[in-house]
């Protein structure tokens, strides 16, 4: 009996504890990211932002959560009720399970699988299904238009994201996220410089992937009232909200892993190795999240045709050209990694 426990049950308990250790701080970070967004945008617009609930408004996310929890969930009469309820749950769950392969520090990762890049690409592609299901199940023209926009936007920018990641794989020679970070430790400076434009393209693409300004066309308030979640209230709305902000943190972690060295110190400065890698990971992700908020506070929304033109006529040819350029340079300089 004891052997059965240690062989089958104990590993499951350890995995469950790891999942709780990752998801609990993540949900807290999502809650306080909403507070940070309101404070940052308030400061940029010369106002104070939330400052009443608790000291410096720090309890505002808790007040918002309690408010949404006790609101009445309203389900439209002619909607597909089962899909209507499932859609926000799908979006939120998918935003959490992507974290399974993200390395927070050296050796600190839930599942260090050899196809981590494929896993995270699959999860990020699936996240649009929750939005499409919500738009269809709501039986509302505004929600349906928002869902169609979201699927078109996802397809447009997923292609360029995939090509950008191919350039990273060409320089590192692995699909394992921990090994990608370790490869950046010894990567020549000129390869880093060559990947820099692709890092910018990747960050702009993930802005579109997460439906954030200036690419928030699926929920454009001036055109679609609130887009795909127009019929949602109470915890359905809260789960969509949490899913969006959890995706923001996830894509910031992806950008950090692929282009900023993950948990490595900036510019591989050796004397900074005394600081734990987790600190550098959080610092880099925090900087990218600030960029998300900064962009929302300063840039207007793109028109839909401009969004499509940028994805298909600018990013797709540029990333294709860059894949050919990077592979040619690596072959010519004999720096192509062995896989």
Curated annotation (Swiss-Prot):
Enzyme class: translocase
Membrane topology: Multi-pass membrane protein
Parts of the chain that traverse the membrane: 9-29, 50-70, 82-102, 115-135, 161-181, 187-207, 235-255, 275-295, 311-331
Keyword Membrane (UniProt): yes
Catalytic activity of the protein: a quinone + NADH + 5 H(+)(in) = a quinol + NAD(+) + 4 H(+)(out)
Main location class: membrane
InterPro entries found in the cross-reference section: NADH_UbQ_OxRdtase_su1/FPO, NADH_UbQ_OxRdtase_su1_CS
Biological processes annotated in GO: aerobic respiration
Entry EC no(s): 7.1.1.-
Pfam families xrefs: NADHdh (PF00146)
Recorded GO MF terms: NADH dehydrogenase activity; oxidoreductase activity, acting on NAD(P)H, quinone or similar compound as acceptor; quinone binding
GO CC terms in record: plasma membrane
Keyword Cell membrane (UniProt): yes
The entry's keywords: Cell inner membrane, Cell membrane, Membrane, NAD, Quinone, Translocase, Transmembrane, Transmembrane helix, Ubiquinone
Annotated HAMAP family: NDH1_NuoH
PANTHER family for this protein: NADH DEHYDROGENASE SUBUNIT 1, NADH-UBIQUINONE OXIDOREDUCTASE CHAIN 1
Family: Belongs to the complex I subunit 1 family.
Record's function text: NDH-1 shuttles electrons from NADH, via FMN and iron-sulfur (Fe-S) centers, to quinones in the respiratory chain. The immediate electron acceptor for the enzyme in this species is believed to be ubiquinone. Couples the redox reaction to proton translocation (for every two electrons transferred, four hydrogen ions are translocated across the cytoplasmic membrane), and thus conserves the redox energy in a proton gradient. This subunit may bind ubiquinone.
Name the record gives this protein: NADH-quinone oxidoreductase subunit H
Annotated source species: Rickettsia peacockii (strain Rustic)
